[in-house]
A protein has these predicted regions:
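Glycine-enriched alpha-helix->loop->beta-strand junction motifs that scaffold or abut catalytic
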Residues: 76-79, 96-102, 130-132, 200-206, ...
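Short, acidic/polar
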Residues: 37-48, 87-93, 225-229
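Beta-strand/loop-dominated core regions that host nucleotide or nucleotide-derived cofactor-binding catalytic loops
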Residues: 342-348, 352-375
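Active-site beta->alpha loop and helix N-cap motifs at the rims of alpha/beta catalytic domains
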Residues: 50, 54-168, 172-173, 189
Length: 378
């Protein structure tokens, strides 16, 4: 199921057998939560998500072993495949022949080959995409905005986010490549609204992928997603969407159903009143995906939600992140952050590390730190 919301007409971008933007209906995306090298499980989840209504299924790759797995996954699934390059943009060259779209994060390009300029790296990505007949997504994220843009716009992360996306669009076009879409994500739905409105006003021609990153557990995560999606889709902003929910593997398809339900409601003029999440405790958690380094992450997020229920009237943010990609940067702005590794959880207060604890030990310490913040009047 998909729906045409054509108040804003972007250019059409072909992704495999489907089109994004232009006159095409809005496409729902999702992301596999299985380990990419677990080929049978990943193929099964690709098919599960496709059957639920996902027009594009994304897989994370971290190294050449993952690329080898994607080659076999491609052979076994009919899903339209996108890959997330994470921190190693060079993997694009070896994975491109087997996928339909590649997502790169502008804020991660500086991690390797620091002697090369960002324009050189973007030019290489454009040539790889062109040579292999694949589309690109420029995926800008609140927790990993490129350092030079943060320095250029001190105190205004939102403007840094938007300007980074605009610059990368211009770079792509300077290299003669325009088969790309853009995403501007934040865990705060109001910031998602502002960022996407600013970008759409500046580049009405570029297709936009919408997402509230780390929306968290349902039902709160669905509500946060609705806050942004209803207002943006109703004005024609958004060509593809994803509801990024924290869910166990066997329920991963529920984020597809949630996104489809929002689309259906907007199409039929049904808008649901939503609460203001700025007035009380806000728990954000990243969507379960193949980057998660311990499957206990989802259970921990649920335990954090239950443990902190007593503090729901306090205006605090607690972030629960499942991997090293999202963990460091996207817990920095939270009052309390939990960055989950393979065997330990790093507990943080803003950008300061409190300590590393086992999954069993971290909850009592979280309660202690939360009580201290409440007592201090935060």
């Amino acid at each position: 199921m998909s729906h045409a919301l054509d108040e804003r007409r972007t250019r059409s971008v072909r992704v495999g057998r489907i089109n994004i933007g232009g006159a095409a209906p809005v496409v729902v995306q999702s992301m596999c939560a299985t380990k990419t090298r677990a080929i049978d499980a990943t193929v099964a989840q690709c098919e599960q998500l496709r059957a639920a209504g996902a027009g594009v299924v994304r897989i994370a790759i971290d190294n050449e072993k993952d690329v080898t797995a994607v080659k076999e996954i491609r052979r076994q699934t009919s899903a339209t495949l996108s890959v997330d390059l994470q921190e190693n943009y060079r993997l694009a060259g070896s994975v491109a022949p087997y996928v339909d779209k590649i997502r790169y994060n502008p804020g991660h390009l500086h991690h390797i080959e620091r002697e090369k300029s960002v324009p050189d790296k973007v030019g290489w990505l454009a040539s790889v995409a062109r040579d292999n007949d694949v589309a690109l997504r420029i995926g800008v994220n609140c927790g990993s905005v490129a350092p030079d843009f943060l320095a250029r716009y001190p105190g205004d992360q939102l403007e840094a986010l938007v300007e980074s996306a605009l610059w990368h669009c211009q770079l792509m076009e300077d290299f003669g490549f325009d088969r790309f879409v853009v995403s501007l994500k934040d865990s705060d739905p109001e910031k998602v609204l502002q960022a996407n409105r600013r970008f759409a006003a500046a580049r009405p021609d570029v297709p936009i992928h919408l997402g509230v990153t780390e929306a968290g557990l349902p039902p709160q995560g669905v509500i946060k997603t609705r806050i942004a999606f209803e207002k943006l889709l109703a004005t024609g902003i958004g060509d593809t969407i994803r509801a990024s929910l924290t869910l166990p593997n066997e329920r991963k398809h529920e984020e597809v159903l949630a996104a489809l339900a929002i689309l259906d409601d907007v199409r039929n003029g049904r808008f649901i009143s939503v609460p203001d999440f700025g007035q009380g405790l806000n728990i954000i958690s990243c969507p379960s995906c193949s980057r998660v380094e311990n499957d206990a992450f989802v259970q921990l997020a649920e335990q954090v939600r239950d443990l902190t229920d007593y503090a729901k009237q306090h205006r605090l943010t607690i972030a629960v992140m499942g991997c090293r990609v999202n963990g460091p940067g996207e817990t920095d702005d939270a009052d309390l952050g939990l960055w989950c590794g393979p065997s330990t959880v790093v507990l943080k207060k803003k950008d300061q590390k409190v300590g590393s604890f086992s999954y069993a030990e971290v909850l009592p310490r979280l309660r202690t730190e939360l009580d201290r913040l409440i007592a201090a009047g935060r």
